């Protein structure tokens, strides 16, 4: 492989870097599994080459969560990539368009970095193997993240970037909408955690967290429907995602108690967001690796 021209740009981006585990491992691996089923033979061969034959769902789908600073307490933490911690959330304005607004630490930086990593992959022939692998892992994860409801920051909310000072709703402290305290089957958690860890696994507990079973259940769109989903630019997808997820915040408030009924009422959205993420990820990779 040729030595770099684009890698320097990518390294510079690493220095620009909210915490999250969007969809959890199950969701990210489900998205990756769906995507892999819709790769062209050429793209699949190239991906297999760079990942040493590993499926996208095995390590690539969750790598960005394992290198983030919130993973330091776990044995599977991979040090040296903490700058990527702020690439997990995106920010949209009142018209569901990408916003330049960021938290004081840079949180909400998913979109510009996703776009850059996609551009990098389009030039994969000019990158080192290791640079291709890193860009590939980032794209796989960020496409999953951008489709998760709790990873969208809406600037219409004055508490857009506020983080909780306490998990106790009776105590003072500004909390962002995705961090408001709710109770699922009596268990206290923030709304962000619900979407990261509960929304999918409780939708189909009989799947026992099998991403293969989830992908088979979710991947049912026709060829024509998939083509329509993938039409347009990444910014067009942002509009679709934000518009679809925004109504969630009209139906829940701080301190609400929810259960299986809520899982079922939001289940169609959760399923559809995962499926769209998988189709769009496949579309991106096919465009990057099929380019002449």
Per-region residue spans from a language model:
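N-terminal, motif-rich segments that launch catalysis or mediate targeting to/interaction with membranes
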Residues: 21-142, 149-292
